[in-house]
Regions:
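Low-complexity, compositionally biased segments
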Residues: 22-24, 65, 69, 81, ...
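Active-site acidic catalytic loop and adjacent metal/ATP-binding pocket
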Residues: 58-110
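Internal "kinase-insert"/substrate-recognition segments embedded within catalytic cores
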Residues: 1-77, 168
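Active-site substrate-binding loop specific to GH73 endo-beta-N-acetylglucosaminidase modules
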Residues: 6-24, 84, 96-103, 108, ...
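Predominantly extracellular/lumenal beta-strand repeat domains
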Residues: 12-13, 19-24, 50-53, 86-88, ...
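Alpha-helical scaffolding within the catalytic cores
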Residues: 26, 84, 126-128
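C-terminal catalytic region of ATP-dependent kinase domains
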Residues: 91-177
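Mixed-charge, polar/low-complexity N-terminal
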Residues: 49, 54, 60-61, 78, ...
Length: 177
């Protein structure tokens, strides 16, 4: 997997590497952390009545929800205090997008890795938990759960098994060698 740096963001989201604030676990690898700090300060000051409006100008809400769902699904045991990336174009109203990284500590303990209560200040989980205070955001989370975990969703057992088998087949010869 490519490291989700400013170059990564530029390649997949458009623009140039230097157009981006790219963070590795809250530290700038491209650009600055100014907007990140501003966003977190506003999140701390927000109320249930204004949190979605306040943070939606900084965060791609569906991306944040999906990012959190993936970490919950896998019970990521090596996350939220580190092993995450976020990037946004450095311009007004540009939104942070979140990227999983170094997630080898997932799917290890199906019965004991409930990560739904993770809430660390200055990390993605804090933003998510602040947003959960709003009923409309909770409904949006439920819609994303429905999309990904039911029907033909990406995280249904059938779709996940198909994806894992495809990946296993791609690396089989390299592992055998």
């Amino acid at each position: 997997m490519e490291r989700p740096s400013g170059a990564f963001a530029a390649a997949y989201l458009g623009g140039k590497q230097n157009d981006y604030d790219a963070l590795n676990s809250g530290k700038a690898i491209n650009g600055t952390v100014e907007s990140w700090r501003e966003m977190h300060e506003l999140a701390r000051q927000s109320t249930p009545g204004n949190v979605v409006e306040t943070l939606s100008s900084f965060v791609d809400l569906d991306n944040l929800i999906d990012y959190m769902l993936v970490n919950f699904y896998g019970g990521n045991d090596d996350w939220d205090s580190h092993n995450w990336y976020a990037a946004r174009k450095r311009k007004p109203n540009a939104k942070y997008r979140f990227f999983c990284w170094d997630s080898e500590r997932t799917l290890e303990n199906a019965e004991g890795d409930d990560k739904t209560h993770v809430n660390r200040v200055n990390n993605p989980s804090f933003l998510f938990n602040q947003l959960l205070r709003d009923e409309s955001f909770r409904q949006r989370v439920l819609q994303r759960v429905q999309l990904h975990f039911f029907g033909d969703g990406a995280l249904t057992p059938e779709r996940a098994a198909t994806r894992y088998l495809k990946l296993a087949n791609e690396i089989h010869n390299a592992v055998v060698a």
